[in-house]
A protein has these predicted regions:
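Acidic, serine/threonine-rich low-complexity disordered tracts
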Residues: 1-154, 192-281
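Short, mixed-charge, low-aromatic patches
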Residues: 81-83, 166-170, 187-190
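Acidic/charged, solvent-exposed loop-and-adjacent secondary-structure segments enriched in E/D, K/R, S/T
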Residues: 157-178
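Anionic-ligand-binding alpha/beta catalytic cores of soluble enzymes and soluble regulatory domains
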Residues: 177-194
C-alpha cells in the first residue's frame, strides 16, 4: 500500500504497503479488468440478500444467522493518523485506515494525503471466512492513476497475466486487518524474533513477504498518549526492485490495531504515520 516519499514521480513495487507506480494499462490488462464486476462502492448500499428492494431481516435475526467466527472480528473501525516525514524537507499530511463489514463481506481502505506531493487510495473487498480474510478485489489509485488485481481461483494481475493464488494471500490494504486479527485471536506469536510469512498480491505480482517481530516499543501518540506496541519489520525480498520498506506497530491494548506505520527509503527519506484517533462501532 508504494507511497514512496523518495520521489513524487516514483513508487516502488516492493513496498508491502503498496505496489509499483501505476502505468498506462496494456490492452490485455484493460480487457481483463473489464471482464470482472466493479467493486461495491459501499457495503452499506448493497442489499445483504443480493436482491434489490427486498426487505431486510430484523437485526436480531440477521445476527443470529451470522457464522460464529464473525464474533472475533471488529465492527466498523476508522483510524486517523498524523503524517510526518522528510523528502527534501519536512513532510506534513494525514492518513486513515477504514474497516467495514456487512455479514461476511468486508471493505477496507487506506488513504494518504501529502498535498500536491502525493495522494494514495488503496481499497480491498472480499469475504471474511473461518480462516481469515479472502480478498476478491484490490485497487490502488496513486494521484489520478488506478491499477487493480482480481483474486478468484487464481490471481489476475493488472497486465492480465494469471498466476497461482497462494493459500491465505492478502493484498496491500487487507494485510493490516488480517495481521491485527491474527494477533488478537492468538494465531500469531508476539515473541521477539518470531518470523511471520505473508503472501501479498499486488498489481505487478504475488510475493511472499516475511515480517520479523522486532520487539515491543513505547510510542508517544499525539492524542492517545504512551502506548506499548509490537514492532513488525519486513525482510527485503529475494529479488528486490527498490529500497522501500514499511514497518508496522500493533498495539495490544488497542485490539492490536496498527498505531504506527513507517515507510522508509534511505536514512533521510521517509513517511511516519502515528495514530491520532480511533472510532469504532
Amino acid at each position: 500500500m508504494a507511497p514512496a516519499p523518495a520521489s513524487p514521480d516514483t513508487a516502488d513495487a516492493d513496498a508491502p504497503l503498496a505496489s509499483e507506480e501505476p502505468q498506462a494499462p496494456s490492452p490485455a490488462a484493460s480487457a481483463a479488468l473489464a471482464e470482472s464486476p466493479a467493486p461495491d462502492e459501499s457495503l452499506a448500499a448493497r442489499d445483504p440478500g443480493g436482491q434489490d428492494g427486498a426487505a431486510a431481516p430484523p437485526a436480531g435475526a440477521a445476527r443470529a444467522a451470522e457464522p460464529g467466527f464473525l464474533a472475533d472480528w471488529p465492527g466498523d473501525t476508522r483510524l486517523t493518523y498524523t503524517l510526518g516525514g522528510n523528502y527534501r524537507g519536512e513532510l506534513h499530511g494525514s492518513a486513515r485506515v477504514l474497516w467495514q463489514r456487512e455479514g461476511t463481506r468486508y471493505h477496507t481502505a487506506v488513504q494518504l494525503d501529502v498535498g500536491l506531493l502525493l495522494s494514495m487510495h488503496l481499497t480491498s473487498q472480499g469475504d471474511i471466512t473461518a480462516t481469515g480474510l479472502q480478498p476478491a478485489v484490490y485497487e490502488e489509485q496513486v494521484r489520478q492513476r488506478r491499477r487493480g488485481v482480481r483474486l478468484d481461483e487464481d490471481v489476475r494481475l493488472h497486465n492480465g497475466q494469471r498466476v497461482a493464488r497462494p493459500a491465505g494471500v492478502q493484498d496491500a490494504a487487507s494485510q493490516f486487518v488480517e495481521l491485527s486479527h491474527r494477533l488478537a485471536t492468538g494465531q500469531l506469536s508476539a515473541e521477539p524474533g518470531t518470523a511471520i510469512p505473508l503472501w501479498l498480491a499486488r498489481p505487478g505480482g504475488v510475493d511472499e513477504w516475511t515480517y520479523d517481530v522486532v520487539g515491543e516499543d513505547t510510542l508517544h501518540l499525539p492524542r492517545l498518549g504512551a502506548v506499548r506496541a509490537l514492532h513488525f519489520r519486513p525482510r527485503p525480498l529475494a529479488k528486490p526492485r527498490g529500497p522501500i520498506h514499511a514497518e508496522i506497530w500493533f498495539a495490544p491494548s488497542l485490539q492490536y490495531l496498527p498505531v504506527r506505520i513507517r515507510i522508509t527509503q534511505g536514512p533521510d527519506t521517509f513517511m511516519d504515520l502515528l495514530a491520532d484517533t480511533i472510532e469504532q462501532q
